[in-house]
Each structure stands twice: as C-alpha cells, then as structure tokens.
C-alpha cells in the first residue's frame, strides 16, 4: 500500500497548526486540517519568541500544551478522513520556533515529540534544523529542497515565494538541480499582522485592503530598510527575534523624533501598514532581480498568497523583467498546505535515510539527514 506521511507546521505567524497527510511519487494530498491556537497557548508561545528573560517553566508548559494540541489534531485528521494508521509511516512535526539564532549556532523548536507519539501511536520525526546548523548552516530555510523536488521545471525558471510570517524565496533555475538556492528576504506577515491587530482588532489585513488605503512613508521605509539583515548576503535567515512590534515601535519613535524627516500628516496607522507592505515587496524584488534568473514564473504560498493587494504590488514591481506572479494552486498544491506538506516530505526523507538540506541554501558544510526520531 502507498506510504502516507503526516506533516505538521506552526509558523512565525502563529495563527494555528496546519496538518497534511500526503504520499509522494507522485504527490497526493489525502487529508488536511487546521486547528487554531487557544488564546492562552498563543500568548505563551508569543512571549517565548521575544527576546528577554523567559522562564523555563513557561517553556515547559508551552512545550506540553502544543504537543497535546498536535497529537489531538493528528488523531482528528486520521479519524475524520478514515485514514489507515498502518500505512502512516511517520509524522514530520516542525514544532514552534521560539528562538532562532544562527549567528550563535542554535535554534529551538518546542512541541514535545514524545507526547505526540504517545497520543498517536505513530513515530515522530522532529528537530529538523539543528543538524544543518551543526554543519555550519543557517538551519533555514529548509523547504527549498521540497520546492525543488516538486516544482522545478526543465525549461522555465521558477521562484517559489513563501509569504508566512517571514518571506523566503526558493530560486529554481530551469533544468539545473545543482543551481537551486534560497534564503529569507525579510518580514512578511509578521509585522503587518501585528500592526493590523493592534489598530483594527483583526488578526490580519484581509486582502491587504487597509494597506491599500494608506500611502508608504518614504522616510520611515528607509529607516526600516537600514536593519542589518537586509544588507547581509545569502545564506541568511531571520525571525521574530529580529522583526517584532518592539523593533517597529523603536523605529517609529526615532522617525518621530527626527525634525527633518517627520511629517505629522503622514503619521497614520494605515500609512505605516502600507510602508510595511512595501518593505516586504521591495526586499522580494531585490532578491529576484539580483539572482541569475532573467525572467520566469513566481509562485506564491503561505498566508500572504491571499493578500491580493500585496500580489498586485509585487506584479507591478516585477513587471520590468516580465515575471508572472501566481498562487501555487496553479501547480496543484494549495498555498495553505505547502509548508506542512514539506514537513511530511522531510519525514519521508528521514525514514529513507536521505539528505534533505541544500548547502547552497543554508550554507552547511554538506548534505545532511535532518531530524531525530521518537519511536513508538
């Protein structure tokens, strides 16, 4: 019978947990599910991702709470879709990243795999990032290897753009498996969602309508772009440690205190939102235009794929070199499920004892088998 792998993903946006049951060769999605975080768990996880003095007790409590939610979700996925547990070979659980510091050689994801295995009776592959980091890599992004396996084309250059909390690109040169590379370009939903929730009470800016109502603030944009991450050369990765509301508030305060740059008429929440959106699209454009790919196709996944204003702005920015911008749904995989499917694929690679990182992407010393197993 066809082997099925379950992928579980919680990203920097922290809007919930995505579950995918998939088989490969060829890719087939058997079932999907999303479970939202309980507000208390989300608050705990959010607090743990921000720099500061975080209690070990808080981390332990969140580690257990998230694992129980994941275990419950997997059982629900299996039962609601009448999947046969005997053909499910493994679960690939990314966990929630609460700290990612490649410059210091460490990354930490929580969501106890032992609890998940105990609740489901299925082996869990977890802790995917640290082996790459031990080999000198960034430990991220890991999904470009999956993008290469599923989306690379023999005659057309493609870019897979993931718009989660952080934006990252996988650059797939036509017919050149050895030429694949990718990296984080900077914040995507992580700042826009937080700013939107603060001022509107909504968890995200639906279709980018609020940002579309505003106008980017040039002086503020220049301050935001001065963050050292944007001047780094790949391989590079980032997260909530670098881009968060505290950082944004600091930049806003500096701008407001600059008598030469500050204009009170520009200082509206919707203009700040428009500025954050432009920060995202400008970094993506820079990443694509500085690549060796002259023209081709951009396919977008992640929550940002549903931000129609962002995609319109991106099409406009990439018009010069005739890049098309579409959802990965055109390629047969919904943008909602790409990352969770990638971790099902990573679980399969581990079970087959095959490498899953791309040194050209992460900067690792070589190809490595990623993850550790918690057996039944």
Curated annotation (Swiss-Prot):
Record flagged with keyword ATP-binding: yes
| Pathway(s) | Amino-sugar metabolism; 1,6-anhydro-N-acetylmuramate degradation; Cell wall biogenesis; peptidoglycan recycling
Output the GO biological process annotations, alphabetical, semicolon-separated.
1,6-anhydro-N-acetyl-beta-muramic acid catabolic process; amino sugar metabolic process; peptidoglycan turnover
Q: What class of enzyme is it?
A: transferase
Reaction catalysis annotation: 1,6-anhydro-N-acetyl-beta-muramate + ATP + H2O = N-acetyl-D-muramate 6-phosphate + ADP + H(+)
* InterPro entries, per database record: Anhydro_N_Ac-Mur_kinase (IPR005338), ATPase_NBD (IPR043129)
Origin organism of this chain? Acinetobacter baylyi (strain ATCC 33305 / BD413 / ADP1)
Keywords (alphabetical) are: ATP-binding, Carbohydrate metabolism, Kinase, Nucleotide-binding, Transferase
Q: Which family does it belong to?
A: Belongs to the anhydro-N-acetylmuramic acid kinase family.
Q: Which domain of life is it from?
A: Bacteria
**UniProt xrefs under Pfam families:** AnmK (PF03702)
Q: What EC number(s) would the UniProt record show? A: 2.7.1.170
NCBIfam families, alphabetized: PRK09585.1-3
UniProt-annotated binding residues for ATP: 11-18
What name appears for this protein in its UniProt entry? Answer: Anhydro-N-acetylmuramic acid kinase
**According to its UniProt entry, what is the function of this protein?**
Catalyzes the specific phosphorylation of 1,6-anhydro-N-acetylmuramic acid (anhMurNAc) with the simultaneous cleavage of the 1,6-anhydro ring, generating MurNAc-6-P. Is required for the utilization of anhMurNAc either imported from the medium or derived from its own cell wall murein, and thus plays a role in cell wall recycling.
MF terms in GO: ATP binding; kinase activity; phosphotransferase activity, alcohol group as acceptor
* Record carries keyword Repeat: no
